[in-house]
UniProtKB/Swiss-Prot annotation:
Annotated S-S bridges: none
Family: Belongs to the class-I aminoacyl-tRNA synthetase family.
Name listed for the protein in its UniProt record: Leucine--tRNA ligase
Gene name of this polypeptide: leuS
Gene3D superfamilies for the chain: HUPs (3.40.50.620), Isoleucyl-tRNA Synthetase, Domain 1 (1.10.730.10)
Chief location of this protein within or outside the cell: cytoplasm
Keywords (A to Z) from UniProt: Aminoacyl-tRNA synthetase, ATP-binding, Cytoplasm, Ligase, Nucleotide-binding, Protein biosynthesis
Gene Ontology molecular function: aminoacyl-tRNA deacylase activity; ATP binding; leucine-tRNA ligase activity
InterPro entries cross-referenced by the UniProt entry: aa-tRNA-synth_I_CS (IPR001412), aa-tRNA-synth_Ia (IPR002300), Leu-tRNA-ligase (IPR002302), Leu_tRNA-synth_edit (IPR025709), M/V/L/I-tRNA-synth_anticd-bd (IPR013155), Methionyl/Leucyl_tRNA_Synth (IPR015413), Rossmann-like_a/b/a_fold (IPR014729), tRNAsynth_Ia_anticodon-bd (IPR009080)
Length: 862
């Protein structure tokens, strides 16, 4: 660069030139390469959720990666061996759809985007060890995804079955339950999800439901919100399974309930429309009616079927069951709100004590039998609606008069002894559906042989490589079904002709173990080494968005536990600490009547905004940055104008990391001004220490002590803030110490000044690595600041021998003086009475009483 640090004066700091220089130097020196010769006690694994390579960073990315980078830099200076890697979650529909649109291969599109985004990440000054880079769509990575699938298959944790699945009609692929939003739409395309029956591959996540639920208690460094979301998704229910005999049949129906205390109130049963017993029980006269009913309810999403507000649809099966508790006959219905995949596919209808059952019973005029009443005898208002609270048993034979909670245990014991009930635990969690009918994904390493059935591709034959020369249309069956030369192969067992599996895996399969591959990404023999995993895992700090609370984070927890069961690793949880950073928001201009968004340039009068098309009032609110809302801010534009350090400082300072951040250009300007102020302060202070004429200036010992006190307070506060991930208050402390030191530097000794600016630059470096590196060299150092140790806090330096003594007259503050801390109460009284403030306000009067609060105040009562 033109101006080396040896000839810089107090000119303005030019970030673009300095940042480009140091980024090149860091890369050339391989400064951030991980030291692999480590022991577990001294490792720190700092990890951001890796991005999908869309081709451009957005401010949400910037916030995520800068947070992790600050922590990585800080921990290095604290003496830890830090692993701070980056990679690319590069399989998936967006690349395939982009390739179809542009008539290029997904790999070409992906490689180009990765190159662009890597340059953008480097411009942020991130301390990434690029030697650890992984890309999930590369053969050297997905070979091991296939290997992991094989291990799961060997251990009966991967299987195929015919299932009713969520079908995205736009993307032409299957979605897991977690990928369908609250409105029954695809999480990616937004299409209304349909139901379809297909042969699908599943991973047996339900085998780990109890461990996934129980071990949430270990994750006390995760946000409570995330743990609650996972707990609700796993959905553990403790209750009983009740067996109902069918009248005039040998068949039986089992139903799960958490409210066995209401069993005497069961007045009907409801089956899912695809319950296996229905076709055996229904009269031939009702088959057409049944088919019509099934077609109607198949159009509903699971969420719609479970909704409390929608009217439930049902159909009487024409067959009755026997309530085992009281031997009463009860009708068997089919209901659209019962889902076969949940529980047993049958529910007992207790309309008196369940809101959904009450609505259903009212719609079809079914009996409503109350078996629990409120504790207040005279209160009969409960008879006008469902009563869902605890109470006293009624109409329940020998259990009448007992509290319902106590009756649960007694009725379960009675039912168990009579062989119609047994204790049962169920989970809402369903097995993970990983089949996808698309091209750009990891091939499932299974070969279908007519003789041998499903056969795993041998580990030494992996990877099953995606064919390159393939025509993508985005319509119909999986593109792989068109590659007959790829499909046709030989059975690994018997050698006869066989066919490859044409489904690819859910991209979450690749992203649920990538944090393990980072440890040894160049290992050609194994996906990872157990001994190395033991050193680095679990990840000490994971940073990513709350939107991954159920999908990625739950799948990663499951796969970690599954790999432990397979004997591949020793850990059972992947991430020790989790930070879910808030969204980055910016101002939007929206017509609330049409929901149409406008850019700022389209609004003529910002103070009185109107829709440029209709003249209606415009709503100005902060929303998540988005191209469609015209409120996105390109990180490259900000870096070009202000530099990466300013962008980093703003993104860290504007809000606590877990809160949403509102973008404000004026606040960015404010951070830029602080960067300039920091630059000038350090440069000018350094020049002071080299100014021979200062030898004639009288130094004040108290100013040296004050400077050391200020810098040590900053060390303590910033260290505590970094340990607690409170980056905004850490930067606030930086600003405070610069302001405080600026007032006294002219009166401090050179020794103190050199010490203070050295510490200041060090504690600045995690936040603003470029300017810190430049300043570090400017003040005479040769080794990178990012290889220095974090300064130690000196508690003695912040202790003061004096304090500000407040002088009160009749309880009102009238002045203050500096006083020594070791003065007695009598000395403080004498000192206070002789002050100008006391003499003025006492006006010759004798004090009636003097109250002394040590090290704080003297109150003179007159």
């Amino acid at each position: 660069m033109n101006n080396t640090t040896s000839d810089i004066n107090d000119q303005r700091y030019e970030p673009r030139e300095v940042e480009a220089y140091w980024q090149k130097e860091w890369a050339s020196d391989d400064l951030y390469r991980t030291n692999t010769e480590v022991n577990k006690e001294n490792t720190f694994y700092a990890l951001s959720m890796f991005p999908y390579p869309s081709g451009s960073l957005h401010m949400g990315h910037v916030r995520n990666y800068v947070i992790t980078d600050v922590l990585a830099r800080y921990k290095r200076m604290k003496g830890f061996n830090v692993l701070h890697p980056m990679g690319w979650d590069s399989f998936g529909l967006p690349a395939e759809n982009a390739a179809i649109e542009r008539e290029i291969s997904p790999s070409t599109w992906t490689d180009k985007n990765i190159s662009q985004m890597k340059d953008q990440l480097d411009r942020l000054g991130l301390s990434i060890d690029w030697s650890k880079e992984v890309t999930t769509c590369k053969e050297e990575y997905y070979k091991w995804t296939q290997y992991i699938f094989n291990q799961l298959h060997k251990n009966n944790l991967a299987y195929q079955k015919k299932a009713t699945v969520n079908w995205d009609p736009i993307d032409q692929t299957v979605l897991a339950n977690e990928q369908v939003d609250a409105e029954g739409k695809s999480w990616r395309s937004g299409a209304k999800v349909e139901k379809k029956e297909l042969n699908q591959w599943f991973l047996r996540i339900t085998s780990f439901a109890e461990d996934l639920n129980k071990d949430l208690i270990k994750l006390n460094d995760w946000p409570d919100r995330v743990r609650v979301m996972q707990k609700n998704w796993i959905g553990k229910s403790i209750g009983a399974e009740i067996t109902f005999e069918i009248k005039n049949s040998d068949q039986k129906i089992t139903a799960f309930t958490t409210r066995i205390d209401t069993v005497y109130g069961v007045s009907y049963l409801v089956l899912a429309s695809n319950h296996p017993l229905i076709d055996q029980l229904i009269s031939s006269n009702d088959i057409d009616k049944l088919n019509d009913f099934r077609q109607t309810q198949e159009k509903l999403s699971d969420l719609e079927r479970n909704s409390d507000t929608r009217q439930k649809l049902g159909m009487y099966l024409g067959v009755d069951a026997i309530n085992p508790a009281n031997n009463k006959e009860i009708p068997i219905w089919i209901g659209d709100y019962v889902i076969m995949e949940y529980g047993t596919g049958a529910v007992m209808g207790v309309p008196a004590h369940d809101s959904r059952d009450y609505q259903f019973a009212k719609s079809y005029d079914l009996p409503i039998q109350y078996v629990i009443k409120p504790n207040i005898d005279e209160d009969e208002s409960y008879l006008n609606a469902e009563f869902v609270d605890k109470g006293i048993m009624i109409n329940s034979d020998k259990f009448n008069g007992i509290e319902s909670d106590i009756a649960k245990t007694q009725i379960l014991e009675f039912g168990s002894n009579s062989n119609w009930a047994k204790p049962k635990i169920t989970y809402k969690l369903r097995d993970w559906l990983i089949s996808r009918q698309r091209y750009w994904g990891c091939p499932i390493p299974i070969i279908n042989c007519k003789k041998c059935g499903q056969v795993r591709v041998p580990d030494n034959d992996l990877p099953v490589v995606l064919p390159i020369d393939i025509k993508l249309t985005g319509k119909g069956k999986s593109p792989l079904t068109t590659k007959t030369e790829w499909i046709n192969t030989c059975c690994p067992k018997c050698g006869t002709e066989a066919k490859r599996e044409t489904d690819t895996m859910d991209t979450f399969m690749c992203s649920s173990w990538y944090f393990l591959r980072y440890i040894n990404p160049d290992n050609c023999e194994k996906p990872f080494l157990k001994s190395e995993i033991d050193k680095w895992l679990p990840v000490k700090q994971y940073v990513g968005g709350i939107e991954h609370a159920i999908l990625h984070l739950l799948y990663s927890r499951f796969l970690t536990k599954a790999l432990k069961k397979c004997g591949l690793i020793n850990i059972d949880e992947p991430f020790k600490k989790l930070l879910t950073q808030g969204m980055v928001q910016a101002v939007t201009f929206k017509n609330p009547n049409t929901n149409k968004y406008f850019s700022k340039d389209q609004i003529k009068d910002i103070d009185n905004p109107k829709d440029p098309l209709t003249g209606e009032n415009i709503e100005i609110i902060y929303e998540k940055m988005s191209k469609s809302k015209y409120n996105g801010v390109d990180p490259s534009v900000v870096i070009d104008k202000y530099g990466a350090d300013t962008a980093r400082m703003f993104i860290l300072f504007k809000a606590p990391p877990e809160k949403d951040l509102e973008w404000d250009d004026s606040d960015v300007e404010g951070q830029y001004r602080f960067i300039q102020r920091l630059w000038k302060f350090v440069i000018n202070t350094f020049k002071l220490t080299n100014n021979n004429s200062r030898s004639n200036i009288e130094k004040e010992k108290s100013k040296d002590e004050e400077a050391l006190r200020l810098i040590n307070i900053a060390i303590k506060e910033i260290t505590d803030d970094l340990d607690n991930l409170q980056f905004n208050t850490a930067i606030s402390e930086l600003m405070k110490v610069v302001n405080g030191l600026s007032l006294i530097v002219n009166y401090c000794s050179n020794e103190t000044l050199n010490k203070v600016i050295s510490i200041l630059v060090k504690i600045t470096s995690p936040f603003s690595p470029h300017i810190a590196e430049e300043l570090w060299k400017t003040i005479g150092n040769t080794q990178s600041i990012h290889l220095q140790s974090w300064p130690e806090f000196d508690a003695g330096a912040i202790e003061q021998d004096t304090f500000k003594l407040m002088i009160q007259i009749n309880g009102k503050v009238r002045g203050s003086i500096n006083a020594s801390k070791n003065l007695s109460k009598e000395n403080l009284e004498d000192l206070a009475i002789k002050t100008e403030a006391a003499i003025k306000w006492m006006d010759g009067k004798e004090p009636k009483r003097i109250i002394v609060v040590p090290n704080k105040l003297v109150n003179i009562v007159i």
